[in-house]
Swiss-Prot record:
The lineage of its organism: Eukaryota, Metazoa, Chordata, Craniata, Vertebrata. PROSITE patterns: MAGE (PS50838). Interacts with DTNA. Interacts with TRIM28. It comes from the Eukaryota. It is found in: Cytoplasm, Perinuclear region; Nucleus; Cell membrane. This is Melanoma-associated antigen E1. Residues 64-97, 149-166, 173-184, 219-236 have a biased composition (Polar residues). InterPro entries: MAGE (IPR037445), MAGE_WH1 (IPR041898), MAGE_WH2 (IPR041899), MHD_dom (IPR002190). The gene is Magee1. GO terms for biological process: negative regulation of transcription by RNA polymerase II. It comes from Rattus norvegicus. Residues 467-666, 721-912 form the MAGE domain. Transmembrane segments: none annotated. May enhance ubiquitin ligase activity of RING-type zinc finger-containing E3 ubiquitin-protein ligases. Proposed to act through recruitment and/or stabilization of the Ubl-conjugating enzyme (E2) at the E3:substrate complex. Residues 719-933 are annotated as: Interaction with DTNA.
Length: 933
């Protein structure tokens, strides 16, 4: 007889026995005391329904062997939730027939499709549905196996109290799920202790699988997650405590859909139809506890698992975005799981994102005192979820350092990812959630917050209760969100607080603000009371925009300051057309995308508006519609009108008092800022990006001694000077991407040879624009050839070596070539440099290309060796190399490669120290462009 026929006969026999033993002689279709009338009836059960009374429901007993597995029984007052175990490929259940192997109990049925078996776990608590079992000596099991399809085996449940007295021990039951292996499965149930039900997770292996539960005792219970191996897989869970339920289930199907709903109200069992979709789906009805109602919605898509979310009436459940403490969750690349702290009477549900590959998440009961429900949210690959049941009094805190049956690292890293479905997980801002919350596995109360943005921050807290854990999570979110310069919404902050503590949000926010003030010197300020948005401010006072100019955002901040200045000079409002006309004078075109700003139009009308630096309002009664720019609330908080006025005065080479109305308004604003709080601004602790150059030094070359000029720079009209300087700025920005020096002849050829009369004045105008707007300095690279280049002093000071870029091929060789020249005595023969590059693995034709490029970019210069025949050349450092790096950096680079200290080269180290001293002295002098003739 084929396996399919045997399975079909067992299934028909099981249904017949269920109808025979259900009710007191009534047909199953006739409504009775134990038969539900509609789907809302609390007595709806999935599988076989057992009625109230002493009736016994016995599962069909296969004929082929001497012993089978006994489904788990529950002691008096125990509750049992249903769980699913799904595998792909061969499935071996505990059926009586034994064909081969050593003393094993193995089923004869092996299917080629998806097989699922439902196991029941019991825990001490209120009376809930209990699986009816056969009397002592009888052994029954129901496993429906369907070839090339999904197979579901479900145990019947009763409604009120147990219908069958326990037969194994005193009120105990042991359920051994099948062991999944490609060859054979061996499962041996062992005697159990008192009031205990153990559900053992399957072992995944390519060889033989052995699953042996340990004898139950009164010791604390633990759960052993499934293990994966290439050989023999053995899964031995430790002993369990009295009345404690341990359940871990595993799903190993690529496209199967498994959802385990959380527990809800007592005595209520609801069976829900399986979700529809393109793939096989398996469903387990929720076991409802006291005080909650469950709304189940699930959808199924091909290749994805959709979790079931619960809506509790009295006990809310936090969603996946709540940062709960992280313990263990096995994904395709590592281990990470999660436990959420529970308050009294609450039921916690958490969604965990899972990567590709087998993934497991397990939860544990906390000695009759906690209620936790966990559901996985899988991406592509098998997933598993475990659930636990609340007993009496939940603990207020969980130990986040304990490992759950697996070896974890010293610290577990939790990274939040964006939700794929906004209906399942709350929507949050994109692109800023790169951070780590590090927890010490030995000290469960130690949390270290690390920011991974441009501003690295670290904070170690040791919260003693869940309140402090929520404070730590909120603090990390505030620090990372502030780096984006977008206002922080109160609704976003609430998402990072566990749901049962959201009613204490004001206290959590107050504690987080205290940490920000004491540790990071930031003030949490409410930006808009109506929208409940906040920003972080430096406690040292309103921050000038120079202090906010980080390396990537420096040019954008300079552009923003010009816009704010134009708005202020125009009467605190400015039309969009006037703003673009002003920016056009400085080389910023509306439709032209520059690498510095990206899309200027989007930067002004979208990014600065979202960051609340600007307000963008339409003008009423205007056809077609025009817009005006105003100062945004963030600009009023972070800067002052006097600072913006001084900034505009530097750009136009004027004095702030040249605008008397705006100067008086700025003075009044400063007085208003000082009087209410009797507060004076303290200079910002960061070094400003640009050195302020005195007007005497910025004067034209005609005023400079030693540089006479017979042409007056003021002989040209102002509009023509602005037009030529704007064209010059565009030339420098375009040539800066190539890193090639710009000679004076090339500049005059581009802007016109007639500009040689006013060249110094044009150069100084362009230098001021490049300095204040774009954050770069225009410097003389070679005084003899009158070549110029752009230089970012702050960027080069922070860099240990010259960074790589698409326009600088082989920069990894550049630092090595410069270091080689320095070690060789500040000059090296061309043949020696090529031999050095050949030793680094550079191809023959590539060496000449690299050195020629470095020569053209003025990183190295070539000097002819006197009296050499044939002619030979020495390579020395060029002016750009001396500008962008230093001898000390080159020496440190060599020492790092050779794993030595810079002092190991004493002569070069002494020379590098002298070079550093000379650079420090030269850095105190302002860098001014001169027209050297």
């Amino acid at each position: 007889m084929s396996l399919v026929s045997q399975n079909s006969r067992r299934r028909r026999g099981g249904r017949a026995n269920g109808r025979k033993n259900s009710g007191k002689g009534r047909p199953a279709a006739v409504p009775g005391p134990a038969v539900p009338r509609d789907r809302s009836d609390p007595q709806i059960l999935q599988g076989l329904g057992a009625t109230e009374g002493p009736g016994t429901s016995v599962l069909p007993t296969p004929r082929g062997g001497s012993s089978t597995s006994v489904p788990p029984t529950a002691s008096e007052g125990s509750s049992a939730p249903g769980q699913l175990i799904t595998s792909e490929g061969r499935n071996t259940s505990q059926l009586p027939t034994s064909r081969k192997g050593r003393g094993t109990r193995r089923p004869p049925a092996v299917s080629a499709g998806l097989n699922a078996a439902a196991s029941i776990t019991a825990s001490e608590g209120a009376s809930t549905p209990v699986l009816p079992t056969a009397p002592k000596g009888s052994k029954a099991s129901e496993h429906l196996t369907i070839s090339e399809g999904a197979s579901i085996s479900e145990q019947p449940q009763s409604h009120e109290g147990p219908n069958v007295q326990p037969t194994l021990g005193e009120g105990s039951g042991t359920s051994v799920p099948p062991t999944f292996s490609e060859e054979s499965g061996i499962s041996e149930p062992l005697p159990s202790g008192e009031g205990l039900s153990i559900s053992v997770s399957p072992t995944i292996s390519e060889g033989a699988g052995i699953n042996e539960p340990s004898p139950a005792s009164k010791a604390p219970s633990t759960s052993v997650p499934p293990t994966a191996s290439n050989g023999l897989g053995i899964n031995l869970p430790p002993t369990s405590s009295e009345g404690l339920s341990i359940s871990v289930l595993f799903s190993a199907s690529e496209e199967s859909d498994i959802s385990v709903p959380p527990p809800s109200a007592e005595g209520l069992s609801t069976s829900m139809p399986p979700p529809s979709g393109e793939v096989q789906s398996t469903w387990v009805p929720p076991i409802i506890l006291e005080g909650c109602s469950v709304k189940v919605r699930s959808t199924s898509r091909k290749g994805r698992r959709t979790p079931v979310r619960s809506a509790a009436c009295e006990s809310p459940s936090p969603s996946a975005e709540c940062l709960s403490t992280s313990l263990s969750s096995i994904s395709a690349e590592g281990f990470c799981s999660s436990l959420a702290p529970c308050a009294e009477g609450s039921d916690t549900c958490e969604l965990l994102p899972c990567g590709e590959g087998p993934s497991t998440s397990g939860l544990h009961d906390l000695e009759e005192e906690s209620s936790i429900s966990q559901m996985p949210l899988a991406a592509e690959g098998p997933s598993a979820s475990g659930s636990s049941i609340e007993d009496e009094n939940p603990e207020e805190a969980l130990s986040c350092g304990a490992s759950v049956g697996m070896n974890l690292c010293k610290c577990t890293s939790l990274a939040l990812q964006k939700a794929d479905d906004p209906s399942v997980r709350p929507k949050r801002a994109e692109g800023f959630l790169d951070f780590q919350v590090l927890r010490d596995s030995e000290n469960s109360n130690s949390i270290t917050i690390m920011g991974l943005g441009t501003a690295h921050v670290a904070l170690t807290l040791k919260p003693q209760d869940p309140m402090e854990q929520n404070v730590a999570e909120l603090l990390q979110f505030l620090l990372l969100k502030d780096q984006t310069k977008y206002p922080i919404k109160e609704s976003e902050m609430r998402e990072f607080i566990v749901q049962e503590y959201r009613n204490q949000f004001p206290e959590i926010l107050r504690r987080a603000a205290a940490h920000l003030e004491c540790i990071f010197r930031f003030e949490l300020k409410e930006l808009d009371p109506e929208e409940h948005t906040y920003i972080l401010l430096n406690k040292l006072g309103p921050v000038p925009f120079e202090g906010l100019e980080d390396i990537p955002n420096g040019p954008k901040m300079g552009l923003l300051m010009m816009i704010l200045g134009q708005i202020f000079l125009n009467g605190n409002q400015a039309r969009e057309a006037d703003i673009w006309e002003m920016l056009w004078r400085f080389g910023v075109q509306r439709e032209r995308r520059l690498s510095v700003f990206g899309n200027p139009k989007r930067l002004l009308s979208v990014e600065f508006v979202w960051q609340r630096y600007l307000d963008y309002r339409p003008i009423t009664d205007c056809v077609p519609v025009e817009y005006e720019f105003y100062w945004g609330p963030r600009s009023h908080v972070e800067t002052t009108k006097m600072k913006i006025l001084k900034f505009m005065a530097r750009i136009y080479n004027k004095d702030p008092m040249d605008w008397p109305a705006q100067y008086n308004e700025a003075l009044e604003e400063e007085a208003e800022r000082d009087v209410p709080n009797n507060w004076r601004a303290v200079p910002h602790f960061r070094r400003p990006l640009f050195q302020e150059v005195s007007p005497e030094l910025l004067a034209s070359d005609s005023d400079a001694p030693g540089c006479p000029s017979k042409y007056s720079p003021h002989s040209w009209p102002e509009s023509r000077l602005e037009s030529k300087s704007r064209k010059l700025v565009q030339l420098f920005l375009l040539m800066d991407s190539t890193k090639l020096p710009i000679p004076k002849k090339g500049i005059l050829y581009y802007i016109g040879r007639e500009c040689s009369k006013v060249f110094p004045d044009l150069l100084n105008r362009a230098a001021r624009t490049l300095n204040h707007v774009y954050g770069t300095e225009l410097v003389v690279l070679d005084p003899r050839n009158h070549s110029y280049t752009l230089y970012n002093r702050r960027e080069m000071e922070d860099m240990e070596e010259i960074m790589d870029s698409p326009n600088r091929p082989g920069n990894n060789f550049l630092m090595q070539v410069l270091s080689f020249i320095f070690i060789m005595g500040n000059h090296a023969r061309e043949s020696a440099v090529w031999a050095f590059l050949r030793g680094l693995g550079v191809q023959n034709g590539r060496k000449h290309v690299i050195t020629c490029r470095y020569l053209s970019q003025r990183y190295i210069d070539s000097l002819r060796v006197p009296d050499s025949d044939p002619v030979q050349y020495d390579f020395v450092w060029g002016p750009r190399a001396r500008l962008e790096t230093s001898k000390m950096k080159a020496l440190r680079y060599v020492a790092r490669i050779h794993r030595k200290e810079p002092q190991d080269w004493p002569d070069q180290y002494r020379e590098a120290l002298e070079d550093e001293a000379n650079r420090a002295e030269a850095g105190r002098r302002p860098l001014v462009v001169r027209n050297l003739r």
